[in-house]
């Protein structure tokens, strides 16, 4: 609604993107608000958790991994991108590539299992499906959307399978068993990375400079932008890191570019720059990376690139898409056979 609190923030230039707004007509109206009513006219990103299909639903990621068919997995992401983009979505919070070996963790089904090699292959297939398979030509079409690999890093390795919990492991195990799928997504050109909630070496990932800068950018060469998970910045207050200004400054200095929901960046970074806690160079770099993603998506040339009102009826839940989903679902089936294996009494 044009008179809502969010609309007023958009007009003031305080919003860089929205998530979970569904419907191309609604998205077009909000994009128009940003482009025509804000001072700088910077277009918004519109994101959604498009995890295993949009309207045409594919097997959950754990099920897709059972196909061991990278072409089929890439096809599923491609169809999801076509449908989501037809409804105004330009950014998906996928693929989720967290390796997990503890069945007590509640999000095992969103990942691809225990094997980092398989996870890396699937990460690449999903990114290619969403963004396009040609690294030199990604995101040019209006049916290709920005991917976001998550949750960086080690989100599936929390102690005792408890969500948001601490992660304590050697570098050897970390890089041999858990990190490759994230790196593989970077190799495939993924445009954004989402930080995880857990801590590593006693430092929350959202404020972990070693993770976000030394590994992700310097070691792997990632040049996209990093976004927090939902309220990832403000949740560090409960973890004892500091007040909202302190945790926001630590996140930006660590390499976080976009604050999801916490509003710590919008509310405190000006004070942090003035007090010297954050440099203008660091703030400019974060802004530049987000703007670069919007340029790469073509939103400055055409803010309504993903707002063709005729596309939903043409491209969503089509007969061809449903047939592909049925075929890939059948390929994912795993049958267990009772072979009368001898059991030794324990």
What do the predicted segments below correspond to?
Residues 1-346:
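Glycoside hydrolase catalytic-domain context in secreted enzymes
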């Amino acid at each position: 609604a044009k008179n809502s609190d969010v609309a007023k923030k958009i007009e003031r230039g305080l919003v860089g993107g929205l998530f979970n707004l569904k419907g191309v007509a609604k998205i077009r109206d909000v994009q128009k608000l940003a482009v025509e009513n804000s001072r700088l006219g910077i277009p918004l990103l519109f994101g959604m958790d498009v995890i295993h299909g949009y309207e045409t639903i594919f097997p959950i990621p754990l099920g897709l991994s059972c196909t061991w068919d990278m072409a089929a997995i890439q096809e599923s992401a491609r169809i999801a991108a076509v449908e989501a983009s037809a409804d105004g979505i330009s950014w998906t919070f996928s693929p989720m590539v967290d390796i997990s070996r503890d069945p007590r963790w509640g999000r095992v089904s969103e990942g691809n299992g225990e094997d980092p090699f398989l996870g890396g292959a699937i990460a690449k297939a999903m990114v290619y499906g969403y963004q396009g398979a040609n690294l030199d030509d990604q995101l040019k079409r209006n049916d290709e959307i920005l991917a976001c690999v998550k949750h960086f890093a080690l989100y599936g390795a929390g102690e005792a399978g408890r969500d948001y919990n601490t992660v304590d492991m050697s570098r050897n195990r970390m890089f041999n068993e858990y990190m490759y799928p994230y790196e593989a997504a970077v190799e495939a050109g993924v445009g954004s990375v989402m930080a995880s909630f857990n801590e590593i070496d006693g430092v929350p990932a959202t404020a972990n400079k070693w993770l976000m800068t030394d590994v992700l950018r310097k070691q792997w060469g990632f040049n996209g932008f990093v976004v927090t998970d939902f309220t990832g910045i403000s949740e560090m207050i409960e973890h004892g890191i500091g007040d909202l200004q302190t945790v926001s400054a630590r996140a930006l200095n660590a390499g976080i570019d976009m604050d999801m929901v916490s509003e710590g960046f919008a509310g405190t970074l000006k004070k942090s720059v003035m007090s010297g806690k954050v440099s203008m160079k660091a703030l400019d770099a974060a802004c530049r990376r987000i703007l670069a993603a919007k340029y790469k998506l073509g939103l400055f040339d055409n803010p309504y690139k993903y707002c063709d009102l005729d596309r939903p009826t043409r491209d969503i839940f089509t007969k061809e898409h449903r047939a592909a989903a049925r075929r890939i679902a059948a390929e994912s089936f795993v049958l267990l056979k009772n072979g009368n294996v001898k059991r030794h009494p324990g």
